[in-house]
Structures are given as structure tokens and as C-alpha cells.
């Protein structure tokens, strides 16, 4: 595999300063013509860099298509906490390093293109915090692959020209209980994450519940 593989370039680009995520579902009365026209309009209004597009399993099925490995989320049977499913038929990741207001208007324009067949069910505003830390202050994305390894990790290959270069996305909204987290002492906070906040070093004897051991894919 070479680095010339086709990918939506925003997938491998650095995390932008500002972002907006839109989840959309099919309208119950949307017919095939409306869906087709909406998707054609979407393709003409997105570039894969400033706007990244994902298709949900239900939409792919509605289009009488098949993507091996694509499926809707279902909570693990052994889950000990509530893990609700929030499926979407379309997922849009709008990216900008300049103006969050421009993202608002771009999102409105895309929603208007899609309105005959899709409705926005969730919209999330995002930003890059302190050059790549999550809101608890720990570095985010430490183990993300880079260079050719990133391409090899992100891109589908050997599935034919229609699928090669595509990617899978698993979207997980998290709520930070910051007041509760801040109430712990520094050592406890580091053990919860599995890394030391001051130097980002992984803790060898971190407990099995540590974040670093549960979020690797």
C-alpha cells in the first residue's frame, strides 16, 4: 500500500482549532429520489478536508448497498453502565482553523441542502484545547499513529475501488464530570487516566480501569 491511497484528507489532517459535528437521520417520508438528490447536493458541497462525511448503516442499507464491517452500534451484553446508542444516518465533521462562525453558517447551508430527506438530530460544537489536551488537562491522542502508519490504520484496502480509501468512524460523546474529577488528588487523577499529567508518561502499574487501557482500538 502506498501513501497515494484515496482518503478524505480531513481524517489525517491535524486536529483543527474549531469544529462542528452534525448527526442527521432520514425523514420518515423521504423517498428514494429525495435521498439521491440530497446526497448529490452534499457531494457537491463537501471536499473531504473542511467537511468530512460519514454514512450510517441504515442509510447504506436504504441505498441497497453493502459495506463489509459497517454496522450500527449495540451495547455490549456485559456492560456494567448505561451505554446508550445514538445512531445517525449521516454524520458531518466540519473543520476550521479560523472562524467558528463560518462553521455555523456552513452547517446551516449543508442542513438546507439535505433538508428534503434528512433532519439534524444533534449538533455539537468543538474546539482544540491547549494545543491538544482534553478538558481534564491530559494530552489527547498520544498514541495516534502517524505518517504511513496512520494511512494503513485509517484506510480500508483490498475491497475494490468503491471502498478502498474509505474509513470507519465510531462516534462517542463523553460528558466530563469535571468537579468530581478535580476533587481527587493528583495521584488518583493520574491513575484514572493511566498517565501522569505533568509529563504525559504512561503509568506501568495503572489499574485495569485506567483510560489508557480501555480506549485503544
What name fits each language-model region?
Residues 1-217:
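Long, histidine/aromatic-enriched segments associated with O2/redox biology
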Amino acid at each position: 500500500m502506498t501513501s497515494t491511497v484515496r482518503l478524505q484528507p480531513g481524517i489525517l489532517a491535524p486536529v483543527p482549532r474549531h469544529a462542528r459535528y452534525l448527526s442527521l437521520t432520514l425523514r420518515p417520508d423521504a423517498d428514494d429520489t429525495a435521498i439521491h438528490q440530497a446526497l448529490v447536493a452534499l457531494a457537491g458541497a463537501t471536499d473531504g478536508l473542511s467537511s468530512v462525511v460519514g454514512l450510517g448503516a441504515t442509510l447504506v442499507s436504504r441505498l441497497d448497498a453493502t459495506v463489509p464491517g459497517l454496522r450500527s452500534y449495540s451495547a455490549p451484553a456485559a456492560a456494567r453502565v448505561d451505554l446508550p446508542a445514538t445512531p445517525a444516518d449521516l454524520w458531518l465533521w466540519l473543520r476550521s482553523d479560523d472562524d467558528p462562525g463560518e462553521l455555523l453558517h456552513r452547517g446551516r447551508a449543508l442542513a438546507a441542502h439535505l433538508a428534503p430527506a434528512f433532519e439534524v438530530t444533534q449538533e455539537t460544537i468543538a474546539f482544540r484545547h491547549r494545543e491538544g489536551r482534553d478538558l481534564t488537562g491530559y494530552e489527547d491522542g498520544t498514541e495516534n499513529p502517524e505518517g504511513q502508519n496512520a494511512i494503513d490504520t485509517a484506510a480500508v484496502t483490498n475491497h475494490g475501488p468503491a471502498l478502498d480509501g474509505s474509513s470507519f468512524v465510531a462516534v462517542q460523546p463523553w460528558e466530563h464530570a469535571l468537579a468530581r474529577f478535580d476533587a481527587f488528588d493528583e495521584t488518583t487523577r493520574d491513575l484514572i487516566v493511566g498517565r501522569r499529567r505533568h509529563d504525559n508518561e504512561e503509568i506501568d502499574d495503572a489499574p485495569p480501569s485506567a483510560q489508557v487501557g480501555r480506549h485503544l482500538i
